[in-house]
Amino acid sequence: MEKFIYSNIKKWIFLPVVSDKERFEIKNAIYNSDLKKNRSHYFNGRWENIYLSHNKIPNLGKILFYAGQIGKNIYGKTVIVPRKDLGYHLNEYWFNISKPGESTGWHDHKKGAKLSGVYYIDVPTNSGNILFRNMDFNKICDWEIESQTGEMILFPANQKHSVDVNMSTRDRISLGFNLYTLPIKEIDQEDGYAFSKYYG
């Protein structure tokens, strides 16, 4: 697998075939769900992750299947996003709604995952870019990718990342997920990413 660095970032950004109408349907389904029922990672006055059932979100399977196909090309082995409807005990995907003034701190994802990713459902202008952190000869190097509606970014699961403050007047909505190679030995802890991997 190639290094995840700024100079080759275009190899990690993709554009799934999902129409504006399909994204609108996803957004509507999210807002019509009980957003307080299944959520986790309460930091800085907001819940980071919202977990919604696969059968309540139209077109979700299509997006996650695409992530698996692209992930295989990157990693060189078959990878999937575990889901309850596929027989796994938890979902390795979650939704993130960042309201105006909110941000996401530095973190990485679960140890067992090989790749992680984000799909942008609705990203208003000035609602925050995704930032990545690499160590270069013991020097911290931070860099960013402009978040754009309809794009998908994959990256190594142990890659530290965060999201800038939402400076817009609208919610920023994205889908996060983890990809695992088969067979999956075990998926530890709760849905999403581990509390111990959050750097605030």
For every predicted segment, state its role:
Residues 1-86, 195:
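Non-heme Fe(II)/2-oxoglutarate
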